[in-house]
A protein has these predicted regions:
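Amphipathic alpha-helical transducer elements in NTP-driven molecular machines
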Residues: 3-6, 42, 77
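Enriched for short, Lys/Arg-rich terminal
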Residues: 51-95
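Basic/aromatic recognition patch in beta-strand/loop cores that engages polyanionic ligands
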Residues: 19-64, 68
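N-terminal first-folded block
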Residues: 1-31
Length: 95
């Protein structure tokens, strides 16, 4: 994914963080499809991110082009879930 494409992915998520689908069994992580120039949504990027509500920031965890990989593995998801649990704990302490 080029830097310009990554910028497009980041902007899409930050504009509408609730648009992504919640990933089953992830504790609330979201996955969104983002269209890339000339590829459309089905051939575009996927982004996995952490977002709770307006009181928390959006944290981009992983972005990838569909042509790079179709989806993440269960073990990769488990790592992201552990990280998201740490994020939630840390942000709650700050409030």
């Amino acid at each position: 994914m080029s830097p310009a494409e990554m910028n497009s992915v980041v902007n899409s998520v930050f504009i509408a963080p609730e648009a992504g689908d919640v990933i089953k069994g992830s504790g609330g992580l979201r996955k969104a499809r983002v269209a890339l120039a000339g590829r459309g949504k089905s051939g575009g990027a996927r982004v996995i991110y952490w977002y709770r509500n307006e009181g928390f920031p959006v944290v981009l965890l992983w972005a990838f082009s569909k042509n790079e990989t179709e989806n993440i593995t269960k073990s990769q998801l488990a790592i992201l879930v552990k990280y998201s649990e740490t994020l939630q704990r840390d942000f709650r302490r700050r409030k």
